[in-house]
């Protein structure tokens, strides 16, 4: 039955219950894992290779969905495809929900804290999960690409690490796959729904939320993928991040995908990106010495 509710002046018609997502049979999936404090409803899905054990010490990747900071979910078709691809190739993948903006609700920096908490959660549970806590990467698309870049580029001295939970555990990652993300939120034509004011009203807030602000010579390696036909997030966003990484001497790869629009997965019709992404992750995660 449909019902109508009013939230902060918004009229919302509830949708029928969504169908249960279809997961492939050739990977193992742990559904709806609680990784945030008990008062939070957001969950994560974990993807494992079928043949693995806690002694395997596999590399891990956090997957951060897109959706303009106010939409999207951990078990959308694209996230299931990405998580399954990683698991089939010897990775443990953690696809997360995180705090989304709603109406005038200010979500920054809680959304970033959630992403960083996911990294901490993997490290804390490394023995049970069979992962190496010293080999963790992050991958995000669109708004998730922005958050993934922020996870990779910010350090404890920037004041953006969550105090709790597990404040003594590092949020750092070894590498980042940024898929058509926003590098400079002030230059993003669509108003970022996660921030309470405009760039003109709060330039320092926008600067603090921009990955470009935090590029340093010791930043982790980046793989940046962006469609040349993207009409939502201009490829210039990625080009600016590439320029900043190059200037700082940070290892990076930039793959403009000819004629690709916004919001593609690892297998857009224009080009199969799985070899590129897996090659990058293998180089910066799999081929590092395993933690003993």
List PLM regions with ranges.
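N-terminal cap/lid segment of alpha/beta-hydrolase-fold proteins
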Residues: 16-55
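Short beta-strand/loop motif that positions the catalytic acidic residue
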Residues: 224-226, 230
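Catalytic histidine neighborhood in serine/cysteine hydrolases
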Residues: 246-263
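Primarily recognizes the serine-hydrolase "nucleophile elbow" in alpha/beta-hydrolase
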Residues: 117-190
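Conserved alpha/beta-hydrolase "acid-adjacent" motif
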Residues: 231-240
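Catalytic nucleophile-loop/oxyanion-hole region of alpha/beta-hydrolase
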Residues: 35, 73-80, 94-133, 267-272
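Short substrate-entry loop that stabilizes the transition state in hydrolases
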Residues: 53-58, 66-106, 146, 186
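Mobile cap/lid helix-loop segments that gate and shape the active-site cleft of serine hydrolases
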Residues: 19-28, 157, 165, 181-214, ...
């Amino acid at each position: 039955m449909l019902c109508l509710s009013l939230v902060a002046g918004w009229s919302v018609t509830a949708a029928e219950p969504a169908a249960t997502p279809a997961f492939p049979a050739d990977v193992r999936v742990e559904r709806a894992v609680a990784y945030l404090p008990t008062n939070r409803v957001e969950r994560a899905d974990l993807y494992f290779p079928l043949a693995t054990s806690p002694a395997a010490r596999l590399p891990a990747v956090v997957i951060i969905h897109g959706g303009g900071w106010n939409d999207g979910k951990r078990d959308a078709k694209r996230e299931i495809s990405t998580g399954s691809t990683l698991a089939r190739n010897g990775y443990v993948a953690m696809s997360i929900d995180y705090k989304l903006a709603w109406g005038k609700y200010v979500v920054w920096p809680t959304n970033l804290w959630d992403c960083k908490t996911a990294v901490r959660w993997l490290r804390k549970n490394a023995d049970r999960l069979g992962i190496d806590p010293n080999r963790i990467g992050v991958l995000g698309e669109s708004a998730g690409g922005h958050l993934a870049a922020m996870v990779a580029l910010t350090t404890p001295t920037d004041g953006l690490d969550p105090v709790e939970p597990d404040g003594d555990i590092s949020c750092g990652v070894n590498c980042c796959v940024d898929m058509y993300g926003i590098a400079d939120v002030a230059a993003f034509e669509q108003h970022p729904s996660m921030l309470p004011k405009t760039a003109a009203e709060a330039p320092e807030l926008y600067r603090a939320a921009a990955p470009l602000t935090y590029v340093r010579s010791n930043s982790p390696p980046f793989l940046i993928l962006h469609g040349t036909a993207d009409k939502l997030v201009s490829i210039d966003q990625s080009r600016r991040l590439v320029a900043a990484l190059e200037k700082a001497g940070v290892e990076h790869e930039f793959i403009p995908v000819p004629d690709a629009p916004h919001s593609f997965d690892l297998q857009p019709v224009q080009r199969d990106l799985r070899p590129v992404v897996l090659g990058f992750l293998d180089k910066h995660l799999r081929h590092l010495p395993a933690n003993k």
